[in-house]
Amino acid sequence: MAIRTRLGDLLRPLNSEYGKVAPGWGTTPLMAVFMALFAVFLLIILQIYNKSLLLEDINVSWESLSF
C-alpha cells in the first residue's frame, strides 16, 4: 500500500494522463520527416565545414568575414 503524502497530492494532477496513449501512430510519421530533414541539414553544415561540399564562388574562410 502506497503512503499518501502532501507532496504526492500536490503532484497527482501532473500524472493524471499516465497510461493514456492516442491510438495508432499519431504524429510519428511527421516527426520522422522532420528528423530526416534535420539530419540532412546537419550533413550539409558538416560538409561545408569540412570543405567537402564545393560551392562555386563562395569563400568559406574566416578571413572573408572581416571588414
Curated annotation (Swiss-Prot):
Transmembrane spans: 29-49
Compartments, as annotated in UniProt: Cellular thylakoid membrane
Cellular component terms (Gene Ontology): photosystem II; plasma membrane-derived thylakoid membrane
Statement: the UniProt record of this protein carries the keyword Protein biosynthesis: no
Record bears the keyword Transmembrane: yes
Any GO molecular function: phosphate ion binding
Keywords of the record: Membrane, Photosynthesis, Photosystem II, Thylakoid, Transmembrane, Transmembrane helix
GO BP term (any one): photosynthesis
Membrane topology listed for this record: Single-pass membrane protein
Function: One of the components of the core complex of photosystem II (PSII), required for its stability and/or assembly. PSII is a light-driven water:plastoquinone oxidoreductase that uses light energy to abstract electrons from H(2)O, generating O(2) and a proton gradient subsequently used for ATP formation. It consists of a core antenna complex that captures photons, and an electron transfer chain that converts photonic excitation into a charge separation.
Xref: NCBIfam families: PRK02624.1
Identification of the protein by name: Photosystem II reaction center protein H
Native organism: Synechococcus sp. (strain JA-2-3B'a(2-13))
